[in-house]
Amino acid sequence: EQLLMVDALKRASAKRITAVLPFYPYSRQDKKALPREPISARLISDMYVAAGVDRMVSIDLHTQQIQGFVDQPFDHLTAMPLFVDYFKEIVDGPISIISPDAGGVKRATIFAKHLEAYVGFVHKKRDPKVHNEVKSFTVIGEVEDRHAILLDDIIDTGGTIAAASRILKERGALSVNVAATHGIFSEGSVEKLHDAPVDKIVVTDTLLQNGNPDKIGNVEVLSVSPIIANALTSIFTDDSVSALFMGENVL
């Protein structure tokens, strides 16, 4: 529908078209994992460019190289300020920020700086032939007698979060909270997360939840509207978007 709207605006001689994609579709498919697979993230960007967009805006991309799929300006926003403010209010005591994978350590490090926290990550061994299947988990970092916050960009099946939260509890974490920008909550995830030893799951409204927070029971949904509004204001007044995040939107 958004592509159709872009086409309609282009045909109506719009001076400039900015497409806002709070959640970038197929962002995890930015490269081939197996032979004869599509690079779906690249296809999405090609479709928007072909439709006529002049600029794209998205929040917490799974991989930032997606910005290089288009020659047009591509603004990458982050919901991290929302999570920082939220956890400053609800967590009192020593904190460890845990990334569910090694690739998210940089994001976790920036997040930890604002909360004066330790940083760790979960090493996952995946089976490339089985979609969303993880063989084993290992926690790297100090979590004993600390409040652990699992920080990720996406919650999909919930398998990683459920398994990691149990390991963190076994390692002596005082509490386990989860912060993820995009709550996909695909089939089967509600049951996994409902049974997981997680105190609070915090996501944003980049995706429509359709009652999932109520089913899981301990989910808080934060609005990204202020972040998008401030970014669009900066874009249309020719101000710096990165300045809104003090450069910390480049992860």
Locate each region found by the language model.
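PRPP-associated nucleotide enzymes
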Residues: E1-L251
